[in-house]
Curated annotation (Swiss-Prot):
EC numbers for this chain: 1.2.1.-
Coiled-coil regions listed: none
Protein name: Putative NAD(P)-dependent glyceraldehyde-3-phosphate dehydrogenase PS5
Organism: Pinus strobus
Superkingdom per UniProt: Eukaryota
Note: On the 2D-gel the determined pI of this protein is: 3.7, its MW is: 35.1 kDa.
Entry's Gene Ontology molecular function annotations: oxidoreductase activity
UniProt keyword terms in alphabetical order: Oxidoreductase
Length: 40
């Protein structure tokens, strides 16, 4: 379950990062995500 959620989170972040409209959300999410997770 954890891996499934993590994969969905990674996919969501990838989608958000590819959408300029979501830039503010990308920056906010980056501040909420632990460094170890963000660097995966």
């Amino acid at each position: 379950l954890v891996s499934m959620v993590d994969e969905r989170a990674v996919a969501w972040r990838a989608h958000a990062m590819g959408n300029p409209v979501n830039l503010p959300w990308k920056l906010a999410a980056a501040n909420l995500v632990p460094t170890s997770t963000a660097q995966k």
